Amino acid sequence: MAPAMGNELQHRTVLLEEAVNALVTRVDGIYIDGTFGRGGHSRAVLAKLGEAGRLIAFDKDPLAIATAQQVADPRFEIVHESFASLRDAMSERAVGRVSGVLLDLGVSSPQFDDPERGFSFRADGPLDMRMDPTRGESAADWLARATVQEMTEVIRDYGEERFAFQIAKALVARRAESDRLGPLVSTGELAQIVANVVKTREKGKDPATRTFQAIRIHINQELAELQVVLEAALSLLEQGGRLVVISFHSLEDRIVKRFMQTHSSAPAVDRRLPIRAVDLPSPPLKLLGRVFASDEEVAANPRARSAVMRVAERIAP
């Protein structure tokens, strides 16, 4: 049964066929799409499921929710929450185990391309950066109160920016001029402040790239929420169920890789103890490898170049 989607997709879904083929092992299973976006993966999953199958999708973005609400398919449900609420949402729906969890991380192309969302330095817009603009603190609000140390830590840790301290000092110096210049509220001005500090240029990369990524990750608590949803997914997967995660930068991929490796490895045993490795419980996950976008996909969709898809299967009951 193919789902009805009211809107055409506004961007190319990365690793679409590869992700859905890795995810769906039972046509009558219950599946989770942790990031509905504009519905690319969800539509493909629904097309693969039988009449008894079920798909529950999550998203924080009100525009994604509006798109999802046009899906005329009784097997589909959208939840307007972060995927970090996965465990509670399944408990509320009396769902014990699921057959697969798909996470397509990061910001979607429509979010980047809309200057009003504040994610991009390529066009001037309000300094927002929230996945859900109706909740939480915006980037402008945070920059208006954060200390040099707080900014330095965020830009260094989440952007891997070696000029983090200098950028933080420049931002606080700009804040001191707020009475004369007004508050810092635009992406264009933030990008210019960073460019004035970062004199060395990485080939093919805007000097503001790392700082924008860092502030966005902090505002949306992306890495903390990723840790939460990975643990929840592991606890919910049935035996034979799949965890499929697509990441777009090294910080995300590092967390996913470490999580999957940790839960697919037997615990270390002190040889001085009277315990044999065979007496220990088997690890819950089995690694099924990683996948990169093909040359053809990258040529058609340059955003796919940085995508890494990791797949693991639950082998323990």
UniProtKB/Swiss-Prot annotation:
Keywords: Cytoplasm, Methyltransferase, rRNA processing, S-adenosyl-L-methionine, Transferase
Coiled coil start-end: none
MF terms (GO), sorted A to Z: rRNA (cytosine-N4-)-methyltransferase activity
Predominant location: cytoplasm
Disulfide bonds: none
Catalytic activities: cytidine(1402) in 16S rRNA + S-adenosyl-L-methionine = N(4)-methylcytidine(1402) in 16S rRNA + S-adenosyl-L-homocysteine + H(+)
Highest taxon of the lineage: Bacteria
Database matches in NCBIfam families: 16S rRNA (cytosine(1402)-N(4))-methyltransferase RsmH (TIGR00006)
Protein family per UniProt: Belongs to the methyltransferase superfamily. RsmH family.
HAMAP family given in the database record: 16SrRNA_methyltr_H
Protein name, per record: Ribosomal RNA small subunit methyltransferase H
Organism: Paraburkholderia phymatum (strain DSM 17167 / CIP 108236 / LMG 21445 / STM815)
Top-level taxonomy: Bacteria, Pseudomonadati, Pseudomonadota, Betaproteobacteria, Burkholderiales
Gene: rsmH
